[in-house]
Amino acid sequence: MNLRDKLDVYLRLSRMDRPIGTLLLMWPCLMALWFAAGGMPDIKVLVIFVIGVVVMRACGCVINDYADRNLDAHVERTQSRPLASGEISSKEALIVFLVMALFAFCLVLLLNPLVVKLSVVGIILTIIYPFTKRYTNMPQMFLGTVWSWSIPMAYAAQTGTVPAEAWWLFAANWCWTVAYDTMYAMVDRDDDLKVGIKSTAILFGKYDRQIIAAFQFAALACFIIAGLIAERGVIYGGGILAFIGFALYQQKLIFGRERAPCFKAFLNNNWAGMALFIALGLDYLVF
């Protein structure tokens, strides 16, 4: 395998060729930075977090594929992944993970001690998550914690503390993550049942759409509370309305529980997050 082919394998292993996960992780992180700063955050902090989100999402993908390397070959959507297809060894994948994790940790060393402490918890959560699919029916809820961990870190980096407002935003993103990752799990539900992977899509069963709606509603409520605490204005409110519109559209897509529409609903959450962040940024700019 030449260098170009090897780089292609690394890109696919870390999902750099599929940025949806990075974007879903980025929007709440950026929102946290803007809320914490009361507008435009410190440039140094912003750059570190943007790079950190990209790297840590890649880390999560690599360790996820390592944990699932013997299962992915039996799932239609994942059987072409580099570890499952044998394009890269388990040892090499672990080395890639360690290098990226070390790089991410070096980034947070440029910030204050509280951020460094929180980052250690974050990397531990990232390593644990892939294995929760073996032992619990609620891995999406654990993922919600992993994918929301950048929020207290962002507040800590910008303000040196993690105020109550941060935890309302954390709760909002946690509920939102459970909702959209359950949509994602609906795509693989039949295959997951065959190979023994657990998920909320399986746990919720015939009530999946209703429970997803409940999590979407809870996320909206927490986003609204975070906005009220920060005294945000009508533009942020417009972002909330847009988020509601996207949530309703996603419910329409998952109504028939078919794979392609469920995956489309999952992808649509990127636009929901982007709309809410842009509204927040404009709200701070205007008010």
Curated annotation (Swiss-Prot):
Specify whether Lyase is a keyword of the entry.
Answer: no
Residue intervals passing through the bilayer: 20-38, 95-115, 211-231, 235-255, 266-286
The annotated pathway is: Cofactor biosynthesis; ubiquinone biosynthesis
A GO CC annotation given for this chain: plasma membrane
The prosthetic group or cofactor this protein requires is: Mg(2+)
E.C. code: 2.5.1.39
The record gives the membrane topology as: Multi-pass membrane protein
Its GO biological process annotations read: ubiquinone biosynthetic process
Q: What does it catalyze?
A: all-trans-octaprenyl diphosphate + 4-hydroxybenzoate = 4-hydroxy-3-(all-trans-octaprenyl)benzoate + diphosphate
EC top class named in words: transferase
Stated family: Belongs to the UbiA prenyltransferase family.
Q: What does this protein do?
A: Catalyzes the prenylation of para-hydroxybenzoate (PHB) with an all-trans polyprenyl group. Mediates the second step in the final reaction sequence of ubiquinone-8 (UQ-8) biosynthesis, which is the condensation of the polyisoprenoid side chain with PHB, generating the first membrane-bound Q intermediate 3-octaprenyl-4-hydroxybenzoate.
Q: What is this protein called?
A: 4-hydroxybenzoate octaprenyltransferase
Taxonomic placement: Bacteria, Pseudomonadati, Pseudomonadota, Gammaproteobacteria, Alteromonadales
